[in-house]
Amino acid sequence: IYQSFIDFEMESVDFDRIITGDLGAVGQKLLFELLDENHKDIKKNHMDCGMQIFDEESQDTHAGGSGCACSALMLSAVILPKLASGEWKRVLFVPTGALLSQVSANEGRTIPAIAHAVWLESGQE
């Protein structure tokens, strides 16, 4: 997200929403801290797909569920319709995901993550 702001020469206010896959409450807090260190604030327009789908209290999803599934569901059911209707004009969609491996988990290794930023626009002024 930070690198996208640099590459696109834009700020968070240039997007209606900055949407992540499924960071959960734990990941969202870390994301905000990392961006704050670089003087970037996305709190007002950030949305996490998993946090929209899951109930943290009843489902114990503090660190997220499935970024791949949450991203696909929210893209087709919420994001694209809001862009098509013109409610949102520009979205930075960052479907976050962990590259899980049973071997590396059993060996106590870290879990690598991936996130590709996709800039989506409604095409409407």
Residues covered by each model-derived region:
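Claisen-condensing/thiolase-fold acyl-transfer catalytic domains that form or cleave C-C bonds
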Residues: D16-E125
